[in-house]
């Protein structure tokens, strides 16, 4: 977290400004020409997707770089030799990354109120999902950071997999607007379930059942935890 505040402009101001540009371009300029979606103005409809777009990228990059730098510099062996458990090591890196992502997500949410009138139907669920998704993808980023052995690889999955899946996951449109064949294909995109659940907490309507979406998120969380367990158990890329 201390590194976050030392690089405040890059860590917080930059994603907020970028998202504000999305609001201006897609929300104001283009949104005024698009009909309401499920009774929600387009400028309001895209807010959950824009927040997720930033939260996912922040969670992964924060956690992956957080564990990668100790590996790169060799100081990870000091961490591993310290009298702390793998659970505590993981909790430290992941909680720092997730906290920053939640803060950025909350700031973007606050920023969105300058562009549209928000009436969040389930605020408690909204913050719960924000925290849950931040933790889940911080765990995923932690795994990427351990797997990567250079700076190119650490950007590989976020750039070529996560970002495209997020844009194709219903951030700027409803899955129901797609042709039937593309709707079926979209259900294989895990990001669809995240955005659908998060949008439900805002407007009480979603492309996919909230129960199915929550099950998918928790399932991926468990998968990441299992992977990290075996990483420490086997010493994968963290032990000489």
Segments from the language model and where they lie:
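Hydrophobic transmembrane alpha-helices and immediately adjacent juxtamembrane helices
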Residues: 1-123, 128-240
């Amino acid at each position: 977290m201390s590194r976050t505040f030392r690089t405040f402009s890059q860590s917080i101001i930059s994603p907020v400004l970028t998202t504000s540009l999305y609001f201006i371009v897609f929300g104001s300029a283009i949104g005024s020409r698009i009909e309401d979606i499920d009774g929600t103005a387009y400028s309001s409809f895209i807010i959950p997707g824009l927040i997720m777009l930033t939260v996912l990228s922040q969670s992964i990059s924060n956690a992956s770089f957080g564990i990668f730098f100790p590996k790169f510099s060799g100081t990870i062996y000091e961490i591993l030799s310290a009298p702390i458990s793998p659970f505590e090591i993981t909790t430290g890196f992941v909680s720092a990354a997730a906290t920053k992502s939640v803060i950025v997500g909350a700031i973007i949410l606050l920023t969105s109120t300058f562009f549209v009138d928000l009436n969040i139907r389930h605020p408690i669920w909204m913050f719960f999902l924000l925290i849950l998704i931040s933790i889940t993808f911080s765990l995923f980023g932690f795994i990427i950071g351990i797997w990567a052995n250079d700076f190119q690889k650490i950007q590989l999955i976020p750039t070529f997999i996560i970002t495209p899946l997020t844009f194709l996951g219903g951030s700027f449109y409803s899955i129901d607007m797609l042709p039937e064949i593309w709707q079926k294909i979209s259900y294989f995109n895990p990001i669809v379930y995240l955005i659908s659940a998060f949008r439900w907490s805002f407007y009480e309507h979603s492309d996919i059942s909230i129960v199915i979406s929550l099950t998918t998120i928790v399932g991926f969380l468990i998968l990441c935890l299992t992977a990290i367990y075996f990483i420490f158990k086997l010493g994968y890329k963290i032990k000489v």
